[in-house]
């Protein structure tokens, strides 16, 4: 039997336009479960493995304070990303019985997770990150142990960081220090390997260039793109298309592309399971548009 995995997510305010497509990509990973804490109601697209936990932003913060002892009361839901090193402890009841837990953003479209994160990979590691130098806050996996659920307690400044009004990268940069050679969790078996799934990242593409594929096809659970033929990818992280929050001084041509669209979603999600769909700077469109050349932008 494959190691079991539960992924923790949260979203407060209003669902992103692509939520139904996010759920569809989760649905095609049926033996992985997502727990999403939200005040947004239930998406139209229902999946047995996507478990919506209805909770207000205020009540979620109160839960975090009660479980961790922190005293911070952030105003912005985005600040909750800094809580991720504590989420295993905060949600210990929901993830009880799973071999692994993880955390994940909702600006991610998944391919076949177990096609890349194999049983052998799970069995040989305690922590799986998809970036080489940080814990990938948008999707990372940890063995479900007391030590890792309470890893935030090994960060003396955790409560101090949570009091900073802006996101402080506790979940990726600061968390990663625990797994460095001199870190408190250096004894654990970690895999920090770039999976090339965050487009427009300054790390560059796997061919050593900054020429990122711009058209991605999701179909029947498989995620491919316009540059790499049949090669499948773990997920696509559209952080740099959906906003300019992380843009460099001179952004790439398609950075923040979705902020300039009248509509991000231009395809009926009810057809996604049957027909697939394309993800690109043009938004979410019919699968047939994935065959166009990147130069068409």
What spans do the regions from the language model cover?
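N-proximal low-complexity "stem/linker" segments adjacent to membrane-targeting elements
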Residues: 1-20
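Short, acidic, metal-binding catalytic loop of nucleotide-sugar glycosyltransferases
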Residues: 23-33
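Active-site-proximal specificity loops/subdomain of glycosyltransferases
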Residues: 39-94
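Short catalytic/ligand-binding loop motif for oxyanion handling, primarily in non-cytosolic enzymes
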Residues: 43-45, 62, 109-113, 118, ...
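GT-A fold catalytic core of metal-dependent nucleotide-sugar glycosyltransferases
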Residues: 83-127
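A short, conserved acidic/glycine-rich loop-to-beta-strand motif
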Residues: 123-139
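Short glycine- and hydrophobic/aromatic-rich loop-to-beta-strand nucleating segment
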Residues: 138-146
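Catalytic core and acceptor-binding pocket of nucleotide-sugar-dependent glycosyltransferases
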Residues: 148-297
């Amino acid at each position: 039997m494959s190691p079991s995995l539960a992924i923790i997510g949260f979203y407060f305010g209003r669902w992103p336009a692509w939520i139904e497509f996010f759920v569809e990509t989760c649905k095609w990973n049926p033996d992985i479960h997502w727990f999403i804490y939200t005040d947004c109601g239930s998406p139209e697209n229902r999946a047995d493995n996507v478990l919506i936990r209805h909770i207000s932003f205020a009540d979620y913060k109160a839960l975090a304070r009660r479980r961790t002892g922190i005293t911070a009361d952030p105003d912005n839901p985005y600040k909750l990303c800094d809580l991720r090193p504590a989420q295993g402890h905060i949600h210990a009841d929901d993830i009880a019985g799973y071999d692994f837990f993880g955390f994940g953003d909702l600006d991610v479209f998944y391919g076949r997770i177990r096609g890349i994160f194999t049983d052998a990979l799970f069995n040989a590691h305690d922590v799986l990150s998809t970036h080489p130098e940080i814990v990938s806050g948008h999707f990372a996996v940890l063995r479900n142990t007391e030590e890792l659920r309470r890893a935030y307690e090994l960060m003396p400044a955790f409560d101090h960081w949570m009091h900073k009004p802006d996101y402080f990268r506790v979940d990726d940069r600061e968390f990663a220090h625990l797994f460095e050679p001199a870190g408190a969790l250096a004894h654990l078996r970690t895999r920090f390997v770039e999976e090339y799934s965050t487009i427009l990242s300054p790390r560059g593409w796997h061919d050593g260039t900054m020429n990122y594929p711009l058209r991605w096809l999701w179909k029947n659970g498989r995620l491919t793109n316009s540059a790499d033929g049949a090669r499948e990818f773990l997920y696509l992280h559209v952080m740099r298309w959906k906003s300019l929050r992380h843009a460099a001084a001179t952004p790439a041509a398609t950075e923040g592309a979705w902020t300039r669209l009248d509509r991000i979603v231009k395809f009926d999600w009810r057809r996604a399971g049957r027909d697939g769909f394309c993800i690109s700077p043009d938004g979410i469109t019919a699968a047939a548009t994935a065959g166009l050349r990147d130069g068409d932008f």
